[in-house]
């Protein structure tokens, strides 16, 4: 099994670029930069895309330009065009249930109320069996404050922790292709930014 599509979830536009909900896109942007593969807008895939080589494999990068709750449209368009199965997709997203400075790989599961994941599961024919990179952003402590929290910008101290976790996640994702998922997961799950 190999990953053929890496997606970073986000809301489009400058006003959302620095918000917690865009952590997935920060990850894909960093990966594109590390691999010297600038993302370019591609209308037929409803997002910014790039092609990279990881561990000798052709991998597509995607940051949808749809709003978060329509992310599945972009993912399904690309998966269908390149004949990519759900278990060959890695979706990077912000995760309320992990603190800033932590990131974890996961295969399958529910959407945990995340509208981007919810739409992807739906557009992949109700198939939740894709890989996720959960990027910790912390929780506001009150479920009624979640929307404002994810659409808010993290303070500098938290941003630093999130950035460090994303940096480690990018290294571990590259490692996944050379050394396998188990090694990459063990390394990423042992990491906590200070």
UniProtKB/Swiss-Prot annotation:
CDD domains for the chain: PTH
Enzyme class: hydrolase
pH dependence: Optimum pH is 8.5.
NCBIfam families per record: pth
Transmembrane segments: none
Mutagenesis or variant effect for residue 67 to A: Complements a deletion, kcat/Km for charged tRNA(Lys) is 33% of wild-type
Protein name: Peptidyl-tRNA hydrolase
């Amino acid at each position: 099994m190999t990953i053929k599509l890496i997606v970073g979830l986000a809301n489009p536009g400058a006003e959302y670029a620095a918000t917690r909900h865009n952590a997935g896109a920060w990850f894909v942007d960093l990966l594109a930069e590390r691999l010297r593969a600038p993302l370019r807008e591609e209308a037929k895939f409803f997002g910014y895309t790039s092609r990279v080589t990881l561990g000798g494999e052709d991998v597509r990068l995607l940051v949808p330009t749809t709003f978060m709750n329509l992310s599945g449209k972009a993912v399904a368009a690309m998966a269908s065009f390149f004949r990519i199965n759900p278990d060959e997709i890695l979706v990077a997203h912000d995760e309320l249930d992990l603190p800033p400075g932590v990131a974890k790989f996961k295969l399958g599961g529910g959407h945990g109320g995340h509208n981007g994941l919810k739409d992807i599961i739906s557009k992949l024919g109700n198939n939740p069996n894709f890989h996720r990179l959960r990027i910790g952003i912390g929780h506001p402590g009150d479920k009624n404050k979640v929307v404002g929290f994810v659409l808010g910008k993290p303070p500098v101290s938290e941003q630093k922790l999130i950035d460090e976790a994303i940096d480690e996640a990018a290294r571990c994702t590259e490692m996944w292709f050379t050394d396998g998922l188990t090694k990459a997961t063990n390394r990423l799950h042992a990491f906590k930014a200070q």
